[in-house]
Amino acid sequence: MSKKYEHLFKFIFVGDSGVGKSSILLRFTEDTFTESYISTIGVDFKIKTVYIEGKAIKLQIWDTAGQERFRVHNNSQYRGCHAVMVVYDVTDQRSFENVAKWIQEIERYARDNVIKMIIGNKSDMISQKVVDPFLAQEFADSLDITFKETSAKQAINIEDAFISLVKLCIDRIEEFKPSSTSSSTIILKKPQSQKSNCIIN
């Protein structure tokens, strides 16, 4: 039986705990949002198919824990990854400062040609914003990484961010071909994960 999609891409979310990775994932895959979403402990993933120029593209999107104590368990999740979304909270300066550390981790564990995107989430919280988007853009430009501000709560730039990444992956599909065997056999078995209650916008 032939596959029903043109390409399969594996995306991963990384970033500090509480920045809204799970909320972005829920907004994109299910178009839902909740103020009291339970945070991820360990790893979890969702599957979504998008259509680019009439072609079906299947996405396997991994949501990882932001806590330092779980990071060692997450390193293996970079295997076969095509793109990584590094998320920070625009109302939390420390989460933005830690973006550099997350990028260092990506460069250490992910494939050399992995595509990266920096996302400043919770852009709807204008009065509480502390991270200057111009500085964030400047930082991203210095690393030749795409930058976008999003709001999972108001569904701002969520789909645009994912579609942009998909198009970048398609444009660079030839670079991924040496790893196509491993990436095309990604195990879709849902990993064991636990949840703890917290508020994430």
Swiss-Prot record:
Q: Name one Pfam family in it.
A: Ras
Record lipid sites (S-geranylgeranyl cysteine)? 198
Kindly state the positions of the motif Effector region in this protein. 37-45
- Name the UniProt key words of this record, in alphabetical order: Cell membrane, GTP-binding, Lipoprotein, Membrane, Methylation, Nucleotide-binding, Prenylation
Q: Which GO terms describe its cellular component?
A: endomembrane system; plasma membrane
Where in the cell is the protein located? Cell membrane
Chain positions found as Cysteine methyl ester = 198
Which PANTHER family does the annotation name? Answer: RAS-RELATED PROTEIN RAB
Q: Which family does it belong to?
A: Belongs to the small GTPase superfamily. Rab family.
Q: What is this protein called?
A: Ras-related protein RabA
Annotated source species: Dictyostelium discoideum
Organism lineage: Eukaryota, Amoebozoa, Evosea, Eumycetozoa, Dictyostelia
